[in-house]
Each structure stands twice: as C-alpha cells, then as structure tokens.
C-alpha cells in the first residue's frame, strides 16, 4: 500500500488576531486635549525666557555705552554735550527719544556717523574733536535695520526709542532731583531714588522702562512688548 500524505489542518485566524492595534477616537481626543494644556502652559514660559534673554542683551549694550561715556569723560574732562545746554550745577537727563539728541549721542561716542562716514568739522568741534571711537554701534542697536541710514535712531533690544541717559554733571558722585519725562512713577524701582533729594550713588545712568506710558517704537508696540532695562556706572 502507498503512503498517505498527511497535511496539517489550517486554523482560521480569529477576529482578534487580525485586528490592528490603534487608538480609539476618545483616546485621540484625550491626547490632543493634554497636548493643548501642556502647550498653553509652556508658551508663556518660553516667551518669558526669550524676554529675559533680550533684557540681558539690552542691559549689556547699555553697560557698554555707560563705560564708553566714562572713557569719554576721562579723555575730554567732561561728558558729551548732546543736549541744548550743559549744566555743572545740576545733574542732566538727556532723552534719546529726541532724534537730534539721539544723533548727537551716536556721533559723540562713535566718532562717526551711524553708517560709518566721517564727522563734519562742526560735529568734531562740538562732539568729539579727535573723532575717537569710544564704542562701536552695530545695526542691531538701531531701529528698523532694513532701512538703516545716518538718520536711524538707537533703540533698546525691545525697539524702545525712549532711552534716557543721565550724567552726574555736578560731579558729586550722586544723581538726584531728576525729573523723568514719564514722571517718577515711570522709573524702574531700583532707580527711584534719583528723583529725590537723597539721590542715587552713580555718575552715569542709562535706562528704558515699560511704566507710565514712557515708551515708544516706530511700529507702535504696546507696554507688554517692552521691559525695564538699566545700567548704572
């Protein structure tokens, strides 16, 4: 007799073994909701980190400018006369929100125009007779870098053009009785005493603020887009 071939019986796949693993609609919606909650919590934190980084960068720039002003005084014996008058009996606040003052500040400290061209004879005589470079301004120090020109204005890293520069022009190592354009309430808390007779020990102060509507940008930003930045020398 011939041998019989025996084949194993095939077992039909169960419905459960053919089903692919996956998420139900409820599980997907739950995951999306969790991601949304996490994103809502993270975005403000990320925004805060970025703002603090810009604040730090702005403070570094202001500190460099203040050091440049100190070197200017060491070189010439006085602070740059960037305003309409120069008083030696009181301390002096200069508003770089004024385009003319802003321009004189740049030319006095850099020894040139914003674009790098040479100072006129009149500017050298009035602002920096040796055309010495006390600080090198970069394009990121000015507003609207895409349209950079000799008329461009310095701003802080938030685009605030209302930069206040204060000199101890009475040479008593204290800045006092300052009347800020935005009022005393606009001052960062650490600078409050400079608006009083008690004063603040300093020779140079540079600051911007987000208080008292004492801020301005060429693109019309609001208070939440600015920050308090200052440097004391």
Task: Give short role names for the model-derived ranges.
Residues 1-23:
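N-terminal leader/signal peptides at the extreme start of proteins
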Residues 5-6, 21-22, 52, 126, ...:
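Small/flexible residues
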Residues 12, 23-29, 67, 149:
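Generic hydrophobic-segment detector
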């Amino acid at each position: 007799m011939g041998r019989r071939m025996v084949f194993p019986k095939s077992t039909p796949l169960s419905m459960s073994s053919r089903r692919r693993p996956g998420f139900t609609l409820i599980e997907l919606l739950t995951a999306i909701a969790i991601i949304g909650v996490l994103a809502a919590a993270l975005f403000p934190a990320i925004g805060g980190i970025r703002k603090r980084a810009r604040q730090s960068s702005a403070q570094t720039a202001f500190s460099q400018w203040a050091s440049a002003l100190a070197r200017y005084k060491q070189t010439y014996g006085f602070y740059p006369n960037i305003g309409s008058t120069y008083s030696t009996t009181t301390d002096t606040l200069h508003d770089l929100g004024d385009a003319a003052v802003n321009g004189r500040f740049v030319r006095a400290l850099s020894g040139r125009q914003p674009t790098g061209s040479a100072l006129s004879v009149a500017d050298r005589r009035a602002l920096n007779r040796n055309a010495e470079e006390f600080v090198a301004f970069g394009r990121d120090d000015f507003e609207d870098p895409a349209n950079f020109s000799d008329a461009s204005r310095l701003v802080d890293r938030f685009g605030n053009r209302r930069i206040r520069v204060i000199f101890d022009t009475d040479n008593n190592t204290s800045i006092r009785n300052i009347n800020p354009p935005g009022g005393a309430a606009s001052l960062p808390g650490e600078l409050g005493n400079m608006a009083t007779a008690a004063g603040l020990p300093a020779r140079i102060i540079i600051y911007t603020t987000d208080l008292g509507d004492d801020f301005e940008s060429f693109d019309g930003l609001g208070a939440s887009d600015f920050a308090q930045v200052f440097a004391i020398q």
